[in-house]
């Protein structure tokens, strides 16, 4: 291994140890609390891996040291360092967790038995619809918010991702609609097209027994079919703010002056995406009196507080998640410490250990999303890309194929990290770490939803150490490391190398097509915000898409 590369990897090693030492020294003077924390469960994958391809015929010892990141002596040094710091780090971790465990045990002791939807006051027809969808008992956010909604209260709902909040606001609207059927009865606003379509599907499913009509209004789609759907006077409208405003201003005969229910879903995200001006204009044409409003959000920022004051009347706050960085207890988190240049090899090893499991891979850029999708398809994996520069039809097609299990790997930017209810995701892989801990929580929240178990694995390279330390700090605990033998990973080097060359050629063709204005497989006609990069502008394929 070259001195430069060795220094880089050694720097990575010392950075982790130094961070842990600083943390241990900082807390050494404070008395430690007693703890009965149980050891973390093993993160070793249990799925059997098919026979790997034959290893390369020739492999130098220098290449092996370079690949693995540490020589044998270095590995012993790392082990000794971890053992030296291990007792202190373990004690610190136990001290940190003791209060949390005590609170969790206290909460469990007083937790009431799970309630059915009938217990919450939901009518029999809608209970039957819930039963048909496999909803046996209500989730905590449903248990807390549905009775309040049925009592006519405005609600602010703060809940962790995957908590079942969509049904929490759809069921009360449908129940009120049964008592007083009316066109344009309810309006649900969502920040993204995908989330809007997902909510519409939930409305259709829960309202199928009572023949509810729902229209979906989102950008990137032809306005004419949407106007036709509005002319049929649907009971419920699910919309993104921008496209809803377009129809309010341009579609003849469409008015919401008799609206009874308004829902702002993912309100923090609505404001993050600069929908504030559109929302102000929409609120001006909505009735203020005789309207019930529900606001659901992952966080309660100052912007959301302002939105609450503008849209709600004497709301009741329902908070299920005590922290914006809380993850569900059924989620098993781990990380792999790997050299940056071998991320593809580690990924293939991980996916082979999870053959047949529904998996979402998260990347930072559109370019990397496309490259990984090509790489995986070349190696025989059923992978689809999902990012903001795909046309709307391609994005919906990718989501529907993944939901229907026609494809088992979705390679996505953070366009898919919030709000999407994709059932039965077994594994989330942070191929690229997100820039902040909140995005991390939303990403890993795609699995272990509604009480199911799931796993999230993060790739941490020598360039990601500081970011990962910040994520761990926000989570309030250390994420356990998942170790992989370099020999197990190295057997994929030859085949992965060939697939990488294929991906490079395809990506070059794609970029050439974009420069010539012909679009291409990655872009579609809908493109993304910011266009095609004409006039020497940076290609949007290389930009972060958070």
UniProtKB/Swiss-Prot annotation:
One of its GO terms (biological process) is rRNA processing. Pfam families: DEAD, Helicase_C. Residues 342-490 form the Helicase C-terminal domain. Residues 519-530 have a biased composition (Gly residues). SMART domains: DEXDc, HELICc. InterPro entries: DDX47/Rrp3_DEADc, DEAD/DEAH_box_helicase_dom, DEAD_box_RNA_helicase, Helicase_ATP-bd, Helicase_C-like, P-loop_NTPase, RNA-helicase_DEAD-box_CS, RNA_helicase_DEAD_Q_motif. ATP binds at residues 159-166. The Q motif is unique to and characteristic of the DEAD box family of RNA helicases and controls ATP binding and hydrolysis. Belongs to the DEAD box helicase family. DDX47/RRP3 subfamily. Interacts with the SSU processome. This is ATP-dependent rRNA helicase RRP3. The lineage of its organism: Eukaryota, Fungi, Dikarya, Ascomycota, Pezizomycotina.
């Amino acid at each position: 291994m070259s001195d430069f590369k060795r220094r880089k990897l050694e720097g990575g090693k010392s950075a982790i140890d130094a961070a842990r030492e600083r943390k241990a020294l900082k807390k050494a003077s404070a008395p430690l609390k007693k703890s009965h924390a149980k050891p973390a469960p093993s993160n070793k994958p249990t799925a059997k891996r098919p026979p790997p391809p034959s290893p390369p015929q020739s492999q130098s010892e220098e290449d092996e040291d370079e690949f693995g990141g540490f020589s044998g002596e270095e590995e012993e040094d790392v082990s000794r360092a971890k053992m030296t710091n291990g007792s202190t780090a373990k004690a610190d971790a136990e001290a940190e967790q003791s209060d949390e465990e005590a609170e969790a045990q206290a909460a469990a002791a007083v937790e009431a038995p799970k309630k059915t939807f009938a217990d919450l006051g939901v009518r029999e027809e809608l209970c039957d619809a819930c039963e048909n969808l496999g909803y046996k008992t209500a989730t905590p956010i449903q248990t807390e918010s549905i009775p309040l909604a049925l009592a006519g209260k405005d609600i602010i709902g703060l809940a962790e991702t995957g908590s079942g909040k969509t049904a929490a606001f759809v069921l009360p609207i449908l129940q009120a609609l049964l008592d007083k059927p009316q066109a344009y009865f309810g309006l649900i606003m969502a920040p993204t097209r995908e989330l809007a379509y997902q909510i519409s599907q939930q409305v259709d499913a829960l309202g199928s027994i009572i023949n509810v009509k729902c229209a979906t209004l989102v950008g990137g789609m032809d306005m004419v079919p949407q106007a036709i759907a509005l002319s049929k006077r649907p009971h419920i409208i699910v919309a993104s703010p921008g496209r809803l405003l377009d129809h309010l201003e341009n579609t003849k005969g469409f008015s919401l002056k008799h609206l009874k229910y308004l829902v702002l879903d993912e309100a923090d995200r609505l404001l993050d995406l600069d929908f504030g001006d559109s929302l102000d204009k929409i609120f001006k044409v909505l009735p203020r009196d005789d309207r019930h409003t529900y606001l659901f959000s992952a966080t309660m920022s100052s912007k959301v507080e302002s939105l609450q004051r503008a849209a709600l009347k004497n709301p009741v706050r329902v908070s299920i998640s005590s922290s914006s960085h809380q993850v569900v207890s059924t989620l098993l988190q781990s990380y792999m410490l790997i050299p940056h240049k071998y991320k593809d090899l580690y990924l293939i090893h991980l996916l082979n250990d999870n053959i047949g499991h529904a998996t979402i891979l998260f990347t930072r850029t559109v370019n990397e999303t496309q490259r990984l999708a090509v790489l995986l398809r070349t190696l025989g994996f059923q992978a689809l890309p999902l990012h903001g520069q795909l046309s709307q039809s391609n994005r919906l097609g990718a989501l529907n194929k993944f939901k229907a299990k026609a494809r088992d790997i979705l390679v996505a930017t953070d366009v898919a990290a919030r709000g999407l209810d994709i059932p039965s995701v077994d594994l989330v892989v942070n191929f690229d770490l997100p820039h902040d801990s909140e995005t991390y929580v939303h990403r890993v929240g795609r699995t272990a939803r509604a009480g199911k178990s799931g796993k999230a694995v993060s790739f941490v390279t020598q360039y990601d150490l500081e970011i990962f330390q910040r994520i761990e700090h926000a989570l309030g605990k250390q994420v356990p490391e998942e170790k992989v033998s370099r020999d197990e990973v190295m057997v994929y080097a030859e085949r992965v190398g060939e697939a990488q060359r294929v991906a490079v050629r395809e990506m070059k063709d794609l970029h050439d097509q974009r420069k010539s204005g012909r679009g291409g497989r990655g872009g579609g006609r809908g493109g993304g915000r910011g266009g095609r990069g004409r006039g020497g502008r940076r290609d949007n394929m290389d930009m972060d898409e958070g």
